[in-house]
Amino acid sequence: MTHAAHIALIDHELDGFHQSLVMYRQQMAAWYSRALDSVSHGLDMPSLLGMDRVLRAGDSQRSASISDADFATVTQCPMGGELKIESLFESVYDVPIGNIPVEVIDLDDGISTVVMLDERGQGSHHCAAGRRYQVRVQGEVSEEQVEALFASYAGLMGDLEQWLRAQWSGFKPHWERSTASAIGSGVLAGSWAAIREVWDSIKQVQAILEAPLNYVEQLGAAAAELAQIATAAPKVMEQAMLLASDEAALYLLLRTAMIWLDALPPDEIAEVAAGFMVSLLIDLVIGAVLTIALPAAGVAYLSLRLVKYGSRILDVAVGFVRGLLAILTTFMQAVDRYKAVAQAD
């Protein structure tokens, strides 16, 4: 690939970045079509496409595939005698799945009652305190509800694109005058296949956040700091966990990292072996998510993971994570405001 062709590739990727979740949804739809056409409907969805829906009933919660129209959870009626029920997407945004029926079954006498959830995905059922109830969802997710889910990421997508364009404005002149033979990192080649390849490794960040002390080798002293945050500032850790479990948000971060790596000036990436790029891609996204809980944790993770590749690569990676910190902080603050407004309505 010539320098001019590489510049054109990055420009093309940036111009199409606002369509990132369209491609994601197309892949979801393609998977569902294959599953429906299959003799076996028990095909395991790739975790990359695993956007889930959630049913909350009292103090119980159950997650299921976005395509699952029939699933249940069991809970105990609280002392007040009112069982609160909520249906929503598993997302950093509490996007509701409303206007659907749920069946509430008293497990002692078998009496069944249908509760219609409102447009906010909420409803309640008068129950006998202390008795156990099964709450079963009986409604599919509509196309309009899926549209509302993905529309909620427009702000994050716009901020990431703006940041990438600002980065590219600094990188592009280096490509225009470079005589280096190294042409890009190659991570954008076969991009969807590359994304599937690294996805399960990226999801490791959930395990790190759930039990940081199990990852002292990867985090160093930051492991103890993360564990302390989980106790002293659970809200902060909750935000990081939400981001780590949100496939759409992680997908956008991964696409950002892929474009950014391929856009880096030739002299920045010349010393990076091609086989190392996939590993670096994984580490960039994990480091970015860890910064939400503790900025030092992201840097510590990258330092311990990348030290063997030299200070230059480490500096490049830390620069990426620090560059995204403000965007992700703003994003999570917007999520909090969104939830506060929704709860006040």
Where do the protein language model's features map onto the residues?
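Cationic, glycine-rich low-complexity segments
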Residues: 1-262, 298-309
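Short, glycine/alanine-rich hydrophobic alpha-helices that insert into or span membranes
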Residues: 268-298
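Membrane-insertive, amphipathic helical modules of secreted toxins and fusogens
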Residues: 302-345
